[in-house]
Amino acid sequence: KDYVEARRLSGAAAAKGHIEAQTLLGHMHLHGEGGEKDLPEARKMHGLAALQGHAGAQVALGTMHFIGSGGPIDFTESRRWYGLAAAQGQADAQANLGQMHVYGQGGPINYGAARRLLGLSVAQGQADAQVMLGKMHFNGEGGPTDVVEARRLLELAAAQDHAGVRAALEVVNKASDERRAKETSDADAMMALLLAEDTEEKKKGAAKSKKNKKKGGAKSTSPPSATPPTSGGGGASA
């Protein structure tokens, strides 16, 4: 690859307003390809292409504003450019904007918007979005806690060798094991309670039956009253 020649040709085309050339030249200035790094010039070139609607340039410009590359950090501008690229279906922009909604960078926290954007990015296989959305499901942010879905998403990211996802997956797996143990313990406790209640009811029934039997037996075996018969004559004979 002849980066020097590519940089020269891109510069000539970019000066004529060619959107792809502006984007490429911005990339080359950003990474020092074909010459020295020039971060302010990279920001300028990406800005020109972004204004013409180039989604890749919009993402790059959003990131430069986010980290303060080639100029000051500006979360509001970062969020704006990510938003424009995300609206074009750019997966990285959707993931980055989703995370900004989670942390309230460049605007208020909005978990609902974050879940929606991250979901769109996940559908395109974006690993960062898989991790972030997995964490949201685990923490119950923007919806109910769903450890099963959290694990599924983190495993998708792990399959792409996403850095750091293993630690998050260990936490989720541990929580899943603890939840299953608790559910088993709760089920066992409930069963024990039901058995105890059933045993108690049986004891009460047996005691009541025994008491009734005692009452019935006493009535049938009691001796008749021994009232002496009266004599029809006078006194007893001598």
Spell out what each predicted region is:
Residues 16-18, 31-33, 52-54, 67-69, ...:
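Short helix-capping/linker turns of helical repeat alpha-solenoids
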Residues 200-221:
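Intrinsically disordered, low-complexity polybasic segments
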Residues 220-238:
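Intrinsically disordered, low-complexity regulatory segments in nuclear proteins
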